[in-house]
Amino acid sequence: SDVYKRQLFISVKPVTTEVMLAAVCDKSLSVLNDANWYWTSATYGPRLNLIRTFVNTYLMEDGTPFTDKEGYKTMVFMDEVKNRDKRLQQTIRMGDYKRIDGGVQTPAPPIFSYTYTGYQPIKYCLDDVFYDSGANNDNSIPLIRFAEVLLNYAEAKAELGVFTDADWEKTIGALRGRAGITGGLTARPTKADPYLQANYFPEITDPSLLEIRRERGIELVFEGLRFSDL
């Protein structure tokens, strides 16, 4: 689980155990990016957010669907994010998120001058507010990484009808395990999730393929692949 941290997306040097190709920044060459500006400005970028329909697809820590919980539709923010897949915490501002201003860490809830939905992204944002105004970021941006290879492998085998429990364990199970999920890591699911079918993939009946699609959405969120996946 140590590999999948925010460090994967905010490190100056690519995390070589995961990243295969990256856009590498270098202050000495004046090669920087504008991730903080893009993801925090009320005027510069398109103010991209997650929506609740998608946030609902993040599993509970025990591997069960959040949408199986009674009352999930009306939960307040602080309740709905409890005990979820840790990638949610690494993707949006939650109650424990802090930023650095003048060397001091301060709580940083979602800012509604930016976010329309309350689910404000942090995936590529450096914590210091210094980086917010202009192209100041020096973090490298992963372009191809091992997780995508695992997901492509899993999906190809599932589409061919030859996806096994062993395949599940070394692909989807491995990705979920490093994100802090404890259940359902060694065997394929046997029941199709009706929430995924109703909201995203009505044409899919295979439980394994449905879960692979869930995993692609969560693992690769904001990495530029969602439109093609859908």
Residue ranges of predicted features:
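Acidic/polar-rich alpha-helix caps and helix-coil junctions
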Residues: 1-37, 68-70, 75-230
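Short, cationic low-complexity segments
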Residues: 39-62, 112-116
